[in-house]
């Protein structure tokens, strides 16, 4: 769609994403994303030491914005085919969700395609395996560091119709909400952080909610 200087801009696609973002923000990530659910289930697998955060975590979270800019916007605009169309480079080169939900089933169910497996398929499956392993240790690594759609929706978190509000008159500053947040957000300090996926764990943990 955005891969040609002569394209007819798909206003309906961008308009729909903006519409959803303006209403829900990253609630989409918390409740509507199937790969988010898969990561949630993987994170429930017991592991000796789960990693909540680490040095460089905040900086690494900026990566999803870089991925959005480079692989969703710039590469499709500047790397085009003879027809002037750009490929969906994020889906083609990175997306582990597409590999798990589309690529793997397609190859497993279609014998004719197995002979066409090349370096790109191996590369994407490597990314998928790394993401799966990290999901057991770290809560939602794909959502935190990679997902360009999460980066897009995060822009709307502070202005979306559905957003969180902390009643400071009732708040007892116990810190339970911050401890409950697996995305490592402190709702008292930033109730509508771009990293908040609206999972509601902070509300469940709040003693005065």
What residue ranges belong to the model's regions?
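Donor-sugar nucleotide-binding helix/loop cap in glycosyltransferases
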Residues: 189
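Non-ligating segments of multi-cofactor redox enzymes
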Residues: 1-184, 194-209
């Amino acid at each position: 769609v955005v891969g040609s200087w002569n394209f007819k801009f798909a206003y309906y696609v961008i308009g729909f994403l903006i519409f959803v973002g303006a209403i829900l923000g990253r609630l989409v990530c918390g409740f509507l994303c199937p790969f988010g659910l898969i990561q949630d289930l993987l994170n429930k697998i017991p592991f000796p030491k789960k990693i909540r955060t680490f040095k460089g975590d905040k900086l690494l979270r900026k990566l999803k914005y870089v991925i959005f800019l480079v692989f969703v916007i710039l590469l499709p605009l500047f790397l085009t085919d003879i027809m002037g169309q750009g490929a969906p480079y994020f889906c083609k080169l990175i997306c582990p969700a597409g590999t798990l939900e589309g690529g793997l089933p397609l190859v497993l169910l279609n014998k004719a395609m197995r002979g066409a497996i090349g370096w790109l398929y191996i590369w994407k499956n490597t990314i998928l395996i790394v993401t799966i392993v990290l999901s057991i240790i770290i809560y939602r690594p794909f959502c935190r560091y990679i997902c360009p759609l999460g980066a897009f929706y995060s822009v709307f978190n502070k202005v979306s119709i559905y957003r969180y509000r902390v009643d400071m008159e009732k708040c007892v500053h116990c810190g339970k909400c911050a401890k409950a947040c697996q995305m490592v957000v402190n709702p008292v300090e930033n109730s509508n952080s771009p990293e908040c996926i609206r999972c509601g764990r902070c509300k469940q943990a709040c003693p005065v909610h």
